[in-house]
Design a protein with these regions (language model features):
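Signature of uroporphyrinogen-III synthase
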Residues: 1-256
Length: 256
């Protein structure tokens, strides 16, 4: 694609990351990109004895995000648990990269960076009688555990972090939303969309609901339910998100 995004402002609703591939791709095409984290990440209490025992005897560990890698291994180290020969899985390439870069672990991961992709991995087909541990944040989808249980696995959640509202960015974000010109927000989860909706409601309801780039139909359904118009990417991979923006944005769309 050679499409230009000149004139478009993009607000990514998460913390700025060094070398963020999505921000870099959109900036290279001429977009003005800013990051506004609506949610902060907090570690949860240390693993209890029962969960530590389940992790220690597990036949596989599954990490569903970079945050799960960071906070999960902090808790594993505190509990004296280190990976030996246990197979380790990641939801996608970015999470696998975090495991490799932070811990030197080569994780198996699908090309389709989501629950459905994980469930297609050959290593997770015949799991009858196995114990698997999913490292994740509080809440979220239950589809992965349900799918593995249907195949006969015993599945435990290790919820190592939680998301909490990050209110200090709200004035700056509200000002950015009110500025004139083409605007697109990037929301990677339903949780972020709900936080955005609450922010707009606190702004007396007069602010229009912006268009939001989202990864997949599930998050798009949440966006519609909250009154946002979704631009739907095939997945959360930076290349797929970029493609969706380029399909959606043309300067002609915003000419009056």
């Amino acid at each position: 694609m050679t499409a230009s995004l000149a004139g478009l402002r993009v607000l990514i609703l998460r913390s700025a990351r060094p070398g963020d591939p999505l921000a870099a791709r959109l900036t290279a095409r001429g977009a003005e990109v800013h990051s506004f984290p609506l949610l902060a990440i907090e570690s949860r209490p240390a693993l209890d004895a029962d969960l530590s025992a389940a992790v220690a005897k597990a036949d596989g560990w599954i990490f569903v995000s970079r945050h799960a890698v960071r906070h999960g291994f902090e808790q594993l180290a505190a509990a004296g648990l280190v990976p030996s020969r246990v197979p380790i899985f990641a939801v996608g390439a970015a999470t696998a990269a975090a495991l490799r870069e932070d811990w030197g672990i080569a994780a198996r991961h699908p090309s389709e960076a989501n629950t459905e992709g994980l469930l297609k991995l050959p290593e997770l087909q015949a799991v009858q009688g196995q114990t698997l541990v999913i490292f994740r944040g509080v809440g979220g989808r239950d589809a992965l555990r349900a799918g593995l249980r249907e195949r006969g696995a015993s599945v435990h959640y290790c919820e190592v972090y939680r998301r909490v509202p990050e209110r200090r960015w709200e004035p700056a974000l509200a000002a950015a939303l009110a500025a004139p010109g083409p605007l697109l927000l990037v929301a990677h989860s339903g949780e972020v969309l709900r936080a955005l909706s609450q922010l707009l409601e606190r702004a007396d309801g007069s602010m229009p609901r912006p268009v939001c780039l989202v990864p997949g139909e599930r998050v798009a359904d949440i966006a519609r339910g909250l009154g946002f118009e979704p631009v739907i990417a095939a997945s959360a991979l930076a290349a797929k998100m970029e493609q969706a923006v380029c399909r959606w944005y043309t300067p002609e769309r915003f000419r009056t």
